[in-house]
Amino acid sequence: MAFDAAMSTHEDLLATIRYVRDRTGDPNAWQTGLTPTEVTAVVTSTTRSEQLDAILRKIRQRHSNLYYPAPPDREQGDAARAIADAEAALAHQNSATAQLDLQVVSAILNAHLKTVEGGESLHELQQEIEAAVRIRSDLDTPAGARDFQRFLIGKLKDIREVVATASLDAASKSALMAAWTSLYDASKGDRGDADDRGPASVGSGGAPARGAGQQPELPTRAEPDCLLDSLLLEDPGLLADDLQVPGGTSAAIPSASSTPSLPNLGGATMPGGGATPALVPGVSAPGGLPLSGLLRGVGDEPELTDFDERGQEVRDPADYEHSNEPDERRADDREGADEDAGLGKSESPPQAPTTVTLPNGETVTAASPQLAAAIKAAASGTPIADAFQQQGIAIPLPGTAVANPVDPARISAGDVGVFTATPLPLALAKLFWTARFNTSQPCEGQTF
């Protein structure tokens, strides 16, 4: 009987050790608070049952929070009330801003941990969100929802830290990552503020009118955050098919066999890749943003810099060197120039722009049917190099020096990136081609 009691006590002790290990994620957590002699006694088969009983009680007392956790009613009740308050206030508005606010709040307050690892950062974030919801009385107004979204955007780094470090269950991690992605996409360019301000009038109130030689100002977002951009690299599972692109469109990931080699992959400069895009002329950016060097060298249209502020053509001083020549000779020169111009126009007639619909529903405009066909083929899974070559469009080979780099804020689908640093994983191909990050900028910093 004494032998059976000792075996039963030893089995209970082993079960307790396994329980503490599984709940904490630390295989040595059960040793906390034990002396070296007690640790040795646990792994010794000849230890008496009385001593094992004392060690067992000591382990359970040390980890009493795992056996007798504090009642979660208060915390869960606060979170439920905060979600209910936010839902009641934001439900008064049928706007994308209000829906995104509610998505982020629900994902944060409903997140659960598998183990205690990383729990402090999650609990702190949840308390801050609960407090923010309680003290706000204007969530039922469009201005209040936008202001609350700016508060949530300020928590992007905290949300990223929770996703990267906390031991979340699968459902919580997926929901929180989807909310983070939507919120991060909304933060780029501060589109909410741009919509509030509306189009700026030329030459009015505080902003001088631009001269003809100046480029139009483009909306820019804050300085790029390498840690934010690199979060997607930390867990390839976050790029699964169930992750929805903000706006309700699901982005399709090309299969590994059809994924083009990364140095020839068209699209925006992706974080962590160090790419310098080379210009493929003739593609207009979604939303009407002009590309650097658009249509440069195509057709006979003069450069914008060839006109002064009144729209008059500016001639080179050398054009006036022969102004004193006889009228007959100048007339002959003009006739020859007209014949050359007519010949050039007859040999290369201008081609009408063509609209291309991408698999995710977005549309881009190409300057020629050939470029449109290349973009459509590449978006359907054809390797980038093959898609462009089939249309007779040459693109730079890997390692080619970029003669006309495009400003990162002005790149679009159809530009070709020539990589000069660490290649990107193939899982990012869908984000690269669909221009999810078409305003990202190359940067250096910590990666996950």
Curated annotation (Swiss-Prot):
Residues 187-198, 307-334 have a biased composition (Basic and acidic residues). Transmembrane segments: none annotated. Residues 187-221, 243-270, 291-361 are annotated as: Disordered. Residues 243-261 have a biased composition (Low complexity). It comes from the Bacteria. To M.tuberculosis Rv0025 and Rv0739. This is Uncharacterized protein Rv0026. It comes from Mycobacterium tuberculosis (strain ATCC 25618 / H37Rv). The lineage of its organism: Bacteria, Bacillati, Actinomycetota, Actinomycetes, Mycobacteriales.
